[in-house]
Amino acid sequence: MAGLSRILLSCTLACLLAGQAAQASVDDPTRAGGDNRVRALRADQARRDVLLTACRDDPGHRRGEPDCVNAERAQALQQWQAAAMTSVDAAFSDLAGALRNAAPRRMEAAIVRLTRQLQPLVYSMMTLLVLLTGYALLARRDRPFEWHIRHALLVAVVTSLALSPDRYLSTVVAGVQDVAGWLSGPWTAPDGAAGRGGLAQLDQFAAQAQAWVAQLAGQAANDANPGSAVNWLLCAMIVAASAGGWLCLAASLLIVPGLIVTLLLSLGPLFLVLLLFPALQRWTNAWLGALVRALVFMALGTPAVGLLSDVLAGALPAGLPQRFATDPLRSTMLAATLCATATLMLLTLVPLASSVNAGLRRRLWPNAAHPGLAQAHRQAAARQYAPRPAAAAAAAGPHQAGTYAASATPAPAPARPAPSFPAHAYRQYALGGARRPPPRVRRDDRPAPAPDRRVLPRKPNLP
């Protein structure tokens, strides 16, 4: 277990350092025009070929330069767009290229976002986790790593509230402002740059889908043939349903986890106060579990939506509105298939996040059905006031004693209420009585012997 603690601790610290490095690289103003350069290289094939040739001739020195990276991304997106109407093998190969070029950037942006929003809590938790793990290794305490994570999370929240409440409040206010900006303000900047990350791409796609539906509906309204008008209208409904499903699911995965995290952090002090009352500690455990689940959905949903938005933008042909006018059915099925595929890929993220949450709940809270000290005290009190096995066997009869005492029906426990004041619960917990498992009685499955009902001869009455 000590080796697992070291491995997980090293991985967590590496992720934090990667997040800080990624944040520094994202804040660089030269990186803001990366998408514009990719679009320019995607349109200028001659310049893209020159850059790709130069990068392939000297891969050791120029492979990691921004021009080479942008050229490779533009080449992957161009190949995927060209293969949208070709064979399945070429489409899947170019899809793999697009994923390979877009996935690192999306994961990097997700790490930066989580590091920015939860920086005070994360660094307090990591400091305490290092201290607890070091103490466990030095003192040779055999404690599971989940115990360190659970206690470090609680102590980090309490410490951040006690020592720097202004930073905790600023974290909550920043989350509220972010959600309010998503719901009210424009998702794209006036100059066309991406102002809200993945939501800017969703806004652009929503504008494109609205134009497609308007074009198809206009064709249906202007067509004098009723049969053709119905076909145009069906195409418009198919495009609206597929694009609307993708937009609703992607926007919900981007907005709802952040909203839930902000709400839970704002209610954090209230749930931490409940730790003082043993009967209400299960509410604090439920709050921590909900916070972890929301963070998992935020960490998985944001890069997935951004990655699929990039792939969908590269897969849709550039002249799709003109194709709607010439070949409406085939163009409609192409757009609907791409949107439905992206929606199904997002839907597969839900069971993945649920399985991750279930694993975290089993590892971090192995006794999830155990609400706290109150139930532990009640279990200890029930064992304390339960009748002893000898008394139960004596009350059951002569043939139920000995080996067959466990199969007897025990006598009902006396109706004496267990003490419920907190001092007794803490004393029971401190003395170890609440954590002691109940005594296991050896059970014998053999039936009880039948009583001897033979008639014995009476003894003669001798004088």
UniProtKB/Swiss-Prot annotation:
Induction comment from the UniProt entry of this chain: Cotranscribed with ptxABCDE. Activated by the two-component regulatory system BvgS/BvgA.
Residue ranges of the region described as Disordered: 376-463
Topology within the bilayer: Multi-pass membrane protein
Entry annotated with the keyword Transport: yes
Keyword hit for RNA-binding: no
Xref: InterPro entries: Conjugal_tfr_TrbL/VirB6
GO cellular component: plasma membrane
Protein's GO biological process: protein secretion by the type IV secretion system
Function (record text): Component of the type IV secretion system ptl required for secretion of assembled pertussis toxin (PTX) through the outer membrane.
Name of the protein in its database record: Type IV secretion system protein PtlD
The species this protein was found in: Bordetella pertussis (strain Tohama I / ATCC BAA-589 / NCTC 13251)
Lineage: Bacteria, Pseudomonadati, Pseudomonadota, Betaproteobacteria, Burkholderiales
